[in-house]
């Protein structure tokens, strides 16, 4: 099922989701370092990465939602997409709560904000796997006729032409 939200010939959600995943993963690393070293700069960087990751997730989400709307009802892909999307809302909520709890004292990393970030990170691993299942196993966002010799997505040529 081909994506309905493309950027330079590729599914927009797939391109954009790399930013929040990277930023939120980096945030957990900085948060861990802040707890271990008690260095305020580490906590401040974790807070900044968390905020940027949340914003990135808010940008990527509409692209995935738009594609999800085109998945046929009653399919396994539609159900997995629903769980994937709602799970990612929870991921952003957990990181958002962590960010809100820390905002008043950016240089301090507390136990509850850290636990929320780690829980969000763990849930993102599950929802990321579900996203991969949708693409790799169920073909969501994959061009119709995709094949090993398909022309570049920037060529303007359909993938099916090279499938002969």
Each language-model region and where it sits:
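Short amphipathic, positively biased membrane-proximal segments
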Residues: 1-164
């Amino acid at each position: 099922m081909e994506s309905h939200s493309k950027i330079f010939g590729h599914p927009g959600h797939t391109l954009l989701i790399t930013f929040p995943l990277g930023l939120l993963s980096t945030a957990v690393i900085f948060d861990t370092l802040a707890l271990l070293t008690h260095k305020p700069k580490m906590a401040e960087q974790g807070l900044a990465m968390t905020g940027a990751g949340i914003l990135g997730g808010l940008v990527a989400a509409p692209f995935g939602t738009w594609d999800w709307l085109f998945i046929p009802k009653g399919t396994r892909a539609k159900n997995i997409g629903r769980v994937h999307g709602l799970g990612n809302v929870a991921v952003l909520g957990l990181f958002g709560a962590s960010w809100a709890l820390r905002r008043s004292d950016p240089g301090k990393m507390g136990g509850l904000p850290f636990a929320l970030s780690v829980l969000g990170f763990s849930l993102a691993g599950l929802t990321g796997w579900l996203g991969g299942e949708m693409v790799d196993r169920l073909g969501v966002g994959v061009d119709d006729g995709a094949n090993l010799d398909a022309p570049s997505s920037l060529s303007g040529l359909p993938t099916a032409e090279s499938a002969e």
